């Protein structure tokens, strides 16, 4: 969740709900000013308009023709225990022009965004705010802190780049890199033994209806899982503006897709790759997908692979069992929720994120960092 300033202050001009196509120029100017990023012209339409889960709620506050603040709440389709997909919200870009911070613009925007979400029939909205704004959400705006996510790390090599990456978890973690790399290679060997001769992992340029069939098979296992249709996966990864994602499919001898993994390639000159999504029908397919992901990242020169998991979740347990190492105790980001329809089944599920199926694919950010 990109959040640029959330400081309360004096009354603010009223925000207006806008369509991205009608306000792209103003949104792009504000995006550049708030975040210092120059890719808004291609990122914002992709993010706000093109998701097969639905268009985002986008609010814009202007003084005259000048944009001073904006708020995006992205549509997500969530399935619960095999039921029909339900539209919910996930907060996205929340931005205030640097010259207009401290005026309460964010507070007004959030309140209106929640009313717009209620009007859309979304029973809940979730968010992953930065540390500066998390307390404002929960103390002033009616949000609840429901859990946290943490970044786990798999050490692929034992060199200086891996030691530098593990320093984030502390000095001892950095010193232990040779042992951690050896332990990781042992875990990868166990993964290969689990799937050897049973499935075949190959790179896939685009997801097909086989991904739809896989999702239908597994979606009933969790009380909260965002819909992973082929259309969504292609939008989220294949058509993403960064072009930094690569997918591998895991196939049974009969040609059915039993699992897949998606990795995010390291930024040029960097050594950190990411396992951003993985879905598997069983333990054999999981092993094949995870090894395909780690092998791809090592092949392109990554020293470590990272993956974010909800604390206490199935995905966190799988990462640990696969050889990923825990972060420093304080290295976490809060998950917050705003319940708009208390009687809805998802109002209960949203308060138990440890039961979710949630990977980096489910975050609002296009790329992990």
Where are these regions (language model features)?
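Conserved acetyl-CoA-binding loop-helix of GNAT-fold acetyltransferases
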Residues: 96, 101-117, 127, 283-296
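A conserved beta-strand-loop-helix scaffold within acyl/acetyltransferase catalytic domains
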Residues: 15-98, 131-132, 201-281
């Amino acid at each position: 969740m990109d959040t640029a300033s959330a400081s309360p202050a004096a009354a603010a001009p009223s925000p207006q709900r806008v369509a991205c196509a009608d306000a792209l120029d103003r949104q792009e100017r504000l995006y550049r000013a708030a975040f210092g990023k120059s890719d808004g012209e291609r990122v914002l339409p992709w993010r706000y308009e093109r998701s097969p889960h639905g268009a985002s709620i986008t609010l814009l506050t202007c003084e005259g023709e000048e944009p001073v603040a904006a708020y995006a709440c992205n549509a997500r389709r969530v399935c619960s225990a095999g039921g029909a997909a339900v539209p919910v919200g996930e907060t996205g870009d929340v931005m205030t022009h640097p010259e207009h911070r401290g005026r309460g613009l964010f507070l007004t925007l959030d309140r209106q965004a929640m009313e717009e979400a209620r009007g859309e029939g979304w029973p809940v909205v979730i968010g992953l705010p930065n540390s500066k704004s998390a307390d404002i959400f929960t103390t002033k705006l009616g949000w609840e802190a429901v859990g946290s996510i943490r970044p786990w790390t798999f050490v692929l090599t034992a060199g200086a780049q891996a030691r530098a990456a593990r320093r984030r978890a502390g000095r001892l973690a950095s010193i232990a890199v040779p042992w951690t790399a050896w332990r990781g290679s042992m875990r990868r060997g166990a993964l290969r033994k689990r799937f050897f001769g049973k499935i075949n992992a190959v790179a896939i340029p685009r997801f097909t209806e086989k991904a739809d069939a896989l999702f239908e098979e597994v979606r009933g296992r969790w009380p909260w899982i965002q819909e992973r249709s082929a259309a969504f996966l292609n939008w989220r990864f294949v058509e993403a503006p960064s072009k930094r994602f690569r997918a591998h499919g895991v196939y049974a001898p009969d040609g059915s897709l039993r699992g897949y993994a998606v990795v995010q390639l390291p930024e040029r000159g960097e050594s950190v790759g990411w396992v951003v999504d993985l879905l598997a029908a069983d333990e054999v397919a999981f092993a094949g997908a995870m090894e395909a992901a780690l092998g791809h990242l090592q092949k392109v020169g990554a020293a470590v692979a990272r993956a974010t998991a909800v604390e206490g979740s199935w995905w966190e347990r799988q990462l640990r069992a696969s050889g990923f190492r825990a972060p420093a105790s304080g290295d976490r980001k809060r998950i917050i929720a705003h319940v708009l329809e208390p009687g809805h089944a998802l109002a209960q599920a949203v308060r138990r994120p440890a039961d979710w199926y949630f990977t980096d694919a489910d975050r609002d950010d296009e790329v992990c960092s």
